């Protein structure tokens, strides 16, 4: 994200390459490619004192230093906040932890599914049709944390620009994900003495099978619920004040369930295209449930020119999305560049003042690759 907004991002990894990179064909895994586009790659052995010294020299020239080791690891490597701050007092230093730098879980290993589970997100996916909850099949904790990190870094840079100087930022995945999930996921726990809602989607907000597929809809206003009854030909419910107003439906759990059942039954007898066309005409938010391969040919996706295809020198054709934010004066740059391990090592060392002989010496010692 920061690279797409113009930052020169340097990815530091071990001389042999990080594990995620090594799983793909020709050392290009799709997930790695999607997460590391537009970065320059430097391979450094951080267990070597020369590697540590090199990193401190590099940090002295940078605006931002980001790490996601477990708590205490960077201090042992000689690259903790105080060490980096000594090299560059104005540095914005961001540590990304699983649970935080302190507390009962701080030393535990953690990955995305664990954070999903411990934030209540997994339990929130249960429904009458799926009594046993399930994981969200995307790295939602990782990505919400990444957005939080990017936002925090830009805020710290703005504060520095206004005279605050450099600073340390801690972003635990637990905190970032819970804050991201909270507005709707914990709406019934926000106020004191809440009434805990059942673990199911509201009956005005559902995914439903049609004759030939699935659609999702959201009826949120009186006008929309009345439009739904017109789409389904339910004049009886359209005329009933208990069923044609959202407030009346929401006051009675049994009534809300009856609304959901009526909508399900009506939509089940229709084709997907007809449902979408008629709901759209009534101003009801709705859409088809697309397979991922179908997304590529969706008319709006194609119109927005979201997906870009380009050729990687070893992996071949790749598809990736453009930067989502469209700036009128300072547009983001799509950088179809995914560096191989250590691809830019010599270039970066040269910028630090190392000559060819010094670089060769570091390579020979295994400090860089």
Positions of the model-derived regions?
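N-terminal helix-loop segment corresponding to the beta1-alpha1 unit
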Residues: 1-162, 189-192, 340, 346-369
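Glycine-rich beta-alpha junction loops
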Residues: 16, 98-100, 173-178, 212-214, ...
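Short Gly/Pro-enriched turn/cap motifs at secondary-structure boundaries
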Residues: 32, 195-200, 205-207, 254, ...
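A short glycine-threonine-serine/GTX helix/turn-capping micro-motif
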Residues: 134-144, 196-205, 214-216, 247-248, ...
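Substrate-binding/catalytic subdomain of NAD(P)-dependent oxidoreductase enzymes
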Residues: 156-195
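Aromatic-enriched alpha-helical interface/lid elements that frame and gate functional surfaces
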Residues: 204-282, 286
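A glycine-rich dinucleotide-binding beta-alpha-beta segment and adjacent secondary-structure elements
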Residues: 273, 281-335
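Flexible, small-/acidic-enriched active-site or ligand-binding loops
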Residues: 315-361
